Amino acid sequence: MEGITKSIRYALRKHGRDAALEDLRCFAGPPLVDKFMEVYGVTREEAEQLVTDFRERYVPIGVYESSPFPGIRELLEALRAAGKKTAVATSKPQPLAELLLERAGLRELFDVVVGSGGGVNNDAKWQIVTRAMELCGAKPENCVLVGDTKYDVEGARKCGIPCIGVRWGYAAEGELEAAGALAVAETVEEVKAMIKAGDSK
């Protein structure tokens, strides 16, 4: 989160704006161009320049200001040991998503990584998720999405798959429940238990 908010503020300051880091948490999750337009009322062209400026700091610096939540590696290893396919479906640009996973030492634990620009004509979350399922050869009834924002929950619903929300991410209090998450986990162990429970049905 820190890498994202600091890089958003860096971009804003280049354009004569400023904001407290806590007020910029809303930029974690949705497509940045859309969020800049929504929050600051800028044109698409201005928003695209803000995103360019964001990446000017985020790629060389911001990616090193975050780390995987404790237990994530072990969860992914357990899923793969059980024969599950794993995928990332993110609104981040494909190359940036790959870079973040490599930096975290997690890339080899995912069969598929799909980001915006990764073969998707429209960057809507549900289309990115659909593309990830296609590349995995998976059907909706055999999938579950684990996400930390309402955009994940909404994207999953449009694809006909359940979403397990996680409390340790970017969502505001009550956001995941209001969006319709199947359940909300407080810990990685709870996510693992929920996935296991789904397998038994």
Model-derived features with residue positions:
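Acidic, Mg2+-coordinating phosphoryl-transfer loop and its flanking beta/alpha structural elements
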Residues: V144-A185
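N-terminal helical cap/lid subdomain that shapes the substrate entry/recognition surface
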Residues: M1-E74, R80-A82, P95
